[in-house]
């Protein structure tokens, strides 16, 4: 069983991984715009100048966090669904994977749900490809379900993928903003049931 630290993103021991983890924590605590490179360096246990050996600055850190997290997330999701034949079960796994990934790392959830979305430049220039890749994974699950006759064929797979993302995104945001420390991954079955009600 993974420990709490192993379950978090960027939990490696290399300087680069430590800097990325520190950036996640500092951005979540202070906000991206208020965060200082010196704070990130201190949290990572490195000199201020060491940050610039790996990254161009705060924006590069934010972009790298998003891109590497998304790439690792999608790789893990695709591995989990690869050997599952039934589309319904694939969708359940995708829902659980989304809520577990962010539900075990509140700082990463804050960065993903809040800090990354403050910048119109970031949203327009850097996030489109990664979001498209995510939606494609979900879309393929829906198409698979339609092809096997499990899911309704009178709904557009891309529209369904966007709706599923919207539901999961709001679940994470609500959990992140809540005063109650509840089990977000524990809600995955109910959320999957709700989504599947519209597809079966």
Question: Can you say where each PLM-predicted feature lies in the sequence?
Answer:
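C-terminal peripheral helix-coil segments that are non-catalytic and often amphipathic
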Residues: 1-4, 21, 93-104, 136, ...
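Short hydrophobic/aromatic patch on the recognition helix
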Residues: 45-55
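Hydrophobic alpha-helical connector segments
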Residues: 64, 78-107, 161-164
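Amphipathic alpha-helical packing segments from all-alpha helical-bundle domains
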Residues: 71-75, 122-148, 158-162, 170, ...
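Amphipathic alpha-helical segments used for helix-helix packing
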Residues: 103-122, 174-177
């Amino acid at each position: 069983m993974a420990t709490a630290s192993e379950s978090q993103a960027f939990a490696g021991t290399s300087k680069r991984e430590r800097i990325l983890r520190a950036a996640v924590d500092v951005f979540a605590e202070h906000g991206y715009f208020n965060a200082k490179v010196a704070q990130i360096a201190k949290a990572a246990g490195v000199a201020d100048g060491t940050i610039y050996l790996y990254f161009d600055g705060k924006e590069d850190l934010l972009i790298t966090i998003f891109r590497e997290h998304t790439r690792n997330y999608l790789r893990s999701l695709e591995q989990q669904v690869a050997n599952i034949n039934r589309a319904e079960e694939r969708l359940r796994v995708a829902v659980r994977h989304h809520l577990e990934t962010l539900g075990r790392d509140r700082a990463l959830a804050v960065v993903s749900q809040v800090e990354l979305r403050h910048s119109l430049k970031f949203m327009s220039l850097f996030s489109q490809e990664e979001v498209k890749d995510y939606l494609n994974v979900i879309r393929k699950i829906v198409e698979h379900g339609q092809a096997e006759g499990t899911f309704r064929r009178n709904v557009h797979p891309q529209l369904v993928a966007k709706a599923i993302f919207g539901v999961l995104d709001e679940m994470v945001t609500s959990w992140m903003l809540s005063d109650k420390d509840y089990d977000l991954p524990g809600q995955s079955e109910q959320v999957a049931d709700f989504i599947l009600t519209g597809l079966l």
